[in-house]
Every structure is written in structure tokens, then in C-alpha cells.
UniProtKB/Swiss-Prot annotation:
PROSITE patterns: FUMARATE_LYASES. This is Argininosuccinate lyase. Disulfide bonds: none annotated. The keyword Lyase applies. GO terms for cellular component: cytosol. The keyword Transmembrane does not apply.
Length: 457
């Protein structure tokens, strides 16, 4: 059923109809459209368009339709309706007859779809926040069990300084906490109802839009009708949040792909999140992580596409805005799936402590400790930096770690070096000395785990 047509003397070309129709993707707004319609029916009672009995009949029919949709949302796709609004109205008319045709009084599809999409966004943000916190909790739990797993930290993908696997986990907790904060901020901004703004100039009926917003669970009503039907900032903001969140998950995936490689061999992924090769029997591929990394690109693309769609649009509604949904639906679905998959990857991961410690001992990751030792002995840091660089060259030439160089060799570079240098160069000392807030010392890591648990409880 089309919601327009009186103005036209020819039927739409079937090719145009297929091009124009949006039911194949906006069917996902069915529940929100029905909920919005129930609220609108109540508003129409307050302005005398519907009697209380008529409203009750409409609400009962809409609630039946809502249950039918929840039981089988795919049924909607069998229809040739133009969009979800016409499908809901058609089904309502089937149930209550001519009374169903009164529901759209004073309402436009412009404010209707804007409301539906905001309601869907609110529901989806709640799901994303839950999945985000589940992953944070999984990371904290993994950190709790791996506080003593010493491994190399990297800059430029070169071994830099020793850290722990727990500290690595907590770095991603911080990223996810920022993602959580961004989603909460976005939720505040989209929590305003555009319903009652009509096509662009507002409704001709003196509906209490604040009351209407409250019925729908919004914090308030929007302030300007022209902006309300044109606004897709919430789409852009959620796509931006998703893009940033997926960058974090992609980096998480890349780190673990490397840690899982034969070259690093720091972790073993569970069989439940890996796959094999059709040719090479020995392969165990980190497909879950590679897909997380790969899916990041499609989310970034959705943000870029939406930016380009909106950048040249005049006020108010334009059909271009129909393009807001597919990218948003796909991006947020993808983000949600990747959050769940990242959590699953952590469930069953095995950290190979001996191999991690062996790698941390290599690469002269304790060189900074030797420089700090010299500074404590009164050597200016820049000079100490140069001295240690020369000592590293000597250690490489001898094929030894710094801590294995004889004292006489170390003293060739600085006479202030004494026997007390060797405890300083141990892995544990390297960790213990990083005791400022946010550092990798066991005390700081334990405190960070405790703080994260308290925040997530």
C-alpha cells in the first residue's frame, strides 16, 4: 500500500518502485514504528482526533501486530509495501478497517522515520554498551590471571621495554572505556524526540510534544521542527563511535595475531576461534581475529559514505536520507559482532609464560634501566643514553645480553658502574621501577585491575 498517489495520473514504473522502496532494510524499524504509532494514537486523543475507545482499539491492534512482528520479523519482507510505515499502516487497516486510516493524522513519514531511527539507535546503544563492558570484564579477568606473565613491549614493532600480558590487557580496557564513554555521550544527544514535527514545519494539532516524548521514553522533545526532520547527527556520531571502536578492536586483533604467530609464539588461541587450511594440515589460522581486523574497513566506509551523503543536502528532508540506514545497521551490527567475538577469543587463550619471558630477556629491553642507573650515579641523561648505546654495541659484538657483560667491560664505558648494576638489569627490577601511576610495576597493575573491577561492577 502506497501512502500517496492522489496527485498522480500514472502508476510508478516497476523499476522505479524497486529502486525507491526501502522495506528490504527498514523492516528492522518495525517494532519502533509500532511503538511510535501507539504513542501517536494517544496524542491524537488529547486533541480530539480520536476518541478514547478508538485509541484503545488501535492500541490493542498495534500490540497484536507487535507480537506478530517479534515472533516472525521476516514476514514483513514478503510484502510489496514501499516502506515499514506503509506496511504497518496496511496491517493496521487489515485489523481495524477504516479506523486505521485516521492514525496518520498530523504526522509525516519525515518525523515518523526520524523517531523510529532514534528509538532503534537507543536500543542498539544499550546492546553495544553491554557488549563493550563484557569485553572489558574479560580483559580484566585475563589480566588478573596473567600479572606475572612478563613479555616484551614494542615500539616500531621492535622490542623496547618489558611489560606484562596483564598490562597489555589493561591498555585495551582503557580504550574500551573511552568507547563506552563516547556511546554514553551519544545516547544523551540522541535522546530527544522529533515526533510531532510533521514534514518540516510542525504539526497543525496542539499536541503536547514533551508529554509525547515521555511516552516514548525520550528525555525531551526537539526544539526546532526544521532541524528535527533533517538531523542525522546521531547517525554520524554513532558511525564515528563505531569507527573508533573498530580501530581499537582491529589493533587488539593485530596484536594477538602477531602474538599467536610462530615468530612470536606468545599465546595459543583456542581451537574454537581458529580454522585450518584446505591444503596444509598443520595450519591453525587466527580467522576470528583476522575478520575483526578486516571488518574495520567496512565500518570506516559507512562513516565516510554517510558524511558524503549529508554534506550537500538542503533543509529539510530529502530522499537521500533514506541512505542513512543500511550503512548504520551494518556498521553497528558489525561492531556488536566483533565485540562478542573478541570476548570469545579471550575465553580459552593460553599465555606461554616461558616463551614470553625469554623474548623479554632479548633485544636489550633493559637498556633504559642501565641509563637510569647512570643518571642515579650523577651522569646527565643524554650522556648516559650515549654510554648505554655503546655498551649495547659491545654486547651485540660479544653475543651477550647486557647483564652478562663482565663488570670490567661495562666500566670501559663509564667508571661509575659497579657491581650493584646487575640487580638493576633484571627483568623484575625493570618492572618494579615503573611504579608511577599507570606504570607496569606489579603494584600498579594490581591497582589498575582493582580499579577496573570496581568500575565495571
Amino acid at each position: 500500500m502506497a501512502l500517496w498517489g492522489g496527485r498522480f495520473t500514472q502508476a510508478a514504473d516497476q523499476r522505479f518502485k524497486q529502486f525507491n522502496d526501502s522495506l528490504r532494510f527498514d523492516y528492522r524499524l518495525a517494532e519502533q514504528d509500532i511503538v511510535g504509532s501507539v504513542a501517536w494514537s494517544k496524542a491524537l486523543v488529547t486533541v480530539g482526533v480520536l476518541s478514547a475507545a478508538e485509541q484503545q482499539q488501535l492500541e490493542e491492534a498495534l500490540n497484536v501486530l507487535l507480537e506478530e512482528v517479534r515472533a516472525n520479523p521476516q514476514q514483513i519482507l514478503a510484502s510489496d509495501a514501499e516502506d515499514i510505515h506503509s506496511w504497518v499502516e496496511g496491517k493496521l487497516i487489515d485489523k481495524v478497517g477504516q479506523l486505521g486510516k485516521k492514525l496518520h493524522t498530523g504526522r509525516s513519514r519525515n518525523d515518523q522515520v526520524a523517531t523510529d531511527l532514534k528509538l532503534w539507535c537507543k536500543d542498539t546503544v544499550v546492546e553495544l554498551l553491554s557488549a563493550n563492558r563484557q569485553l572489558q570484564s574479560a580483559l580484566v579477568e585475563t589480566a588478573q590471571h596473567n600479572q606475572d606473565a612478563v613479555m616484551p613491549g614494542y615500539t616500531h614493532l621492535q622490542r623496547a621495554q618489558p611489560v606484562t600480558f596483564a598490562h597489555w590487557c589493561l591498555a585495551y580496557v582503557e580504550m574500551l572505556a573511552r568507547d563506552e564513554s563516547r556511546l554514553q555521550d551519544a545516547l544523551k544527544r540522541l535522546d530527544v524526540s522529533p515526533l510531532g514535527c510533521g514534514a518540516l514545519a510542525g504539526t497543525a494539532y496542539e499536541i503536547d510534544r514533551e508529554q509525547l516524548a515521555g511516552w516514548l521514553g525520550f528525555a525531551s522533545a526537539t526544539r526546532n521542527s526544521l532541524d528535527s526532520v533533517s538531523d542525522r547527527d546521531h547517525v554520524l556520531e554513532l558511525l564515528s563511535d563505531a569507527s573508533i571502536g573498530m580501530v581499537h578492536l582491529s589493533r587488539f586483533a593485530e596484536d594477538l595475531i602477531f602474538f599467536n604467530s610462530g615468530e612470536a609464539n606468545f599465546v595459543e588461541l583456542s581451537d574454537r576461534v581458529t580454522s585450518g587450511s584446505s591444503l596444509m594440515p598443520q595450519k591453525k589460522n587466527p580467522d576470528a581475529l583476522e575478520l575483526i581486523r578486516g571488518k574495520c574497513g567496512r565500518v570506516q566506509g559507512a562513516l565516510t559514505g554517510m558524511m558524503m551523503t549529508l554534506k550537500g543536502l538542503p533543509l529539510a528532508y530529502n530522499k537521500d536520507m533514506q541512505e542513512d540506514k543500511e550503512g548504520l545497521f551494518d556498521a553497528l551490527d558489525t561492531w556488536l559482532d566483533c565485540l562478542h567475538m573478541a570476548t570469545l577469543v579471550l575465553d580459552g587463550i593460553q599465555v606461554k609464560r616461558p616463551r614470553c619471558a625469554e623474548a623479554a630477556q632479548q633485544g636489550y629491553a633493559n637498556a633504559t634501566e642501565l641509563a637510569d642507573y647512570l643518571v642515579a650515579k650523577g651522569v646527565p641523561f643524554r650522556e648516559a643514553h650515549h654510554i648505554v648505546g655503546e655498551a649495547v654495541v659491545e654486547a651485540i659484538a660479544q653475543g651477550k645480553p647486557l647483564e652478562a657483560l663482565p663488570l670490567v667491560d661495562l666500566q670501559k664505558f663509564s667508571p661509575v658502574i659497579a657491581d650493584d648494576v646487575y640487580p638493576i638489569l633484571s627483568l623484575q627490577s625493570c618492572l618494579d621501577k615503573r611504579a608511577a601511576k599507570g606504570g607496569v610495576s606489579p603494584q600498579q597493575v594490581a591497582q589498575a585491575i582493582s580499579d577496573a573491577k570496581a568500575r565495571l561492577s
